[in-house]
Regions:
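Conserved sequence signature across two-component system core domains
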Residues: 7-8, 33, 51
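Two-component/phosphorelay signaling modules centered on CheY-like receiver
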Residues: 11-31
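Conserved phosphotransfer microenvironments
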Residues: 36, 52-68
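Conserved phosphotransfer cores of two-component systems
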Residues: 44-46, 68-75, 95
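Active-site beta3 strand of CheY-like receiver
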Residues: 46-52
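Hydrophobic/aromatic residues positioned on beta-strands within the core alpha/beta folds
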Residues: 79-80
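Alpha4 helix (beta4-alpha4-beta5 surface) of REC/receiver domains from two-component response regulators
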Residues: 83-101, 105, 109-112, 133
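CheY-like receiver
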Residues: 109-115, 119-139
Length: 139
């Protein structure tokens, strides 16, 4: 089960996203945040696998991308925005997002993006297990 945290300042968007994700049995929405500060706290408390991050929350100017990226740790970040321009893409990259999704196309793109994050983590976990097995057999 892939644990997802939704971070968006719009309650309407958070509700819509939660309803869309409810249809996917392999995804569990573990929480919601309406600000960057609340997002950072919920990441620490809830330990989600994936963060759906609205790039344009009002107080984003108070948060430096490098700081946010370092606090995200191993959380796979999927950025969402109504604008898909060069500046938004650059901001998404600065936060370490694996992709930027257009909010107008979320229904078709969101679940596949989340599942790609989950499979990436599974691939990494599988690779680590194989590596440790080889090392154990070599000793």
């Amino acid at each position: 089960m892939c644990k997802v945290l939704i971070a968006d300042d719009s309650e309407v968007m958070r509700t819509a996203i939660r309803k869309m994700l409810r249809e996917e049995s392999s995804i569990d929405v573990v929480g919601e945040a309406s600000s960057f500060a609340e997002t950072m706290q919920k990441i620490a408390d809830l330990k989600p696998d994936v963060l759906l991050l609205d790039l344009h929350m009002p107080e984003k100017r108070d948060f430096k991308p490098a700081l946010v990226k370092s606090q995200l740790g191993t959380v796979c970040t999927v950025a969402v925005s109504f604008s898909n321009d060069t500046d938004s893409k650059a901001l998404a990259e600065s936060y370490g997002a694996v992709t930027l999704l257009d909010k107008m196309k979320l229904y078709n793109e969101m679940v596949p993006a989340i599942l790609r994050c989950e499979s990436r983590e599974s691939d990494i976990g599988s690779l680590l297990r194989k590596t440790f097995k080889r090392k154990a057999h070599a000793t």
